């Protein structure tokens, strides 16, 4: 059912500080500008690697869901892993049929890549928050 790993989400209190790590320490040169996703309550920036992306996620506003994560992990850290799926609704239904909890209403919403996404609860995924996203077009490939 799942396709390739698309990205690993990393929560951070400062995307700008995280850029320094990826640029200065790891030598990455392809990093997108920071942009707001108000409907999700986050700022995002993508670190583009040859085979995947790192999604840097910073809270946007007081109601951001990332605040809770950073309260427990003040320096930030791995937030989720994201896999591509060819059919987001079939993937959602398959997760539910297998007893996994799809977060929110279960209706896909548009994610940072401009395609529908869902999140599956970590308690059902070995302790890892899993994002499933509709396979994006070539413009969004690392």
Positions of predicted regions on the chain:
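A short, acidic/glycine-rich surface segment
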Residues: 33, 63-68
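Short, structured motif recognition centered on aromatic/hydrophobic residues
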Residues: 5, 12, 19-22, 47, ...
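A short beta-turn/loop motif at secondary-structure boundaries
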Residues: 36-39, 73, 109-112
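Alpha-helix termination/capping residues and helix-transition junctions
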Residues: 2, 25-28, 75, 97, ...
């Amino acid at each position: 059912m799942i396709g390739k790993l698309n990205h690993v989400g990393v929560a951070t209190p400062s995307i700008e500080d995280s850029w320094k790590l990826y640029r200065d320490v790891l030598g990455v040169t392809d990093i997108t500008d920071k942009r707001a996703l108000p409907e999700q309550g986050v700022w995002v920036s993508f670190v583009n690697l040859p085979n995947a992306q790192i999604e840097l996620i910073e809270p946007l506003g007081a109601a951001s869901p990332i605040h809770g994560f950073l309260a427990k992990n003040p320096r930030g850290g791995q937030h989720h892993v994201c896999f591509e799926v060819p059919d987001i609704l079939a993937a959602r239904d398959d997760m539910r049929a297998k007893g996994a909890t799809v977060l929110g209403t279960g209706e896909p919403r548009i994610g940072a890549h401009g395609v529908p996404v869902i999140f599956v609860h970590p308690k059902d995924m070995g302790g890892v928050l899993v994002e499933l996203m509709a396979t994006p077009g070539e413009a969004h490939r690392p």
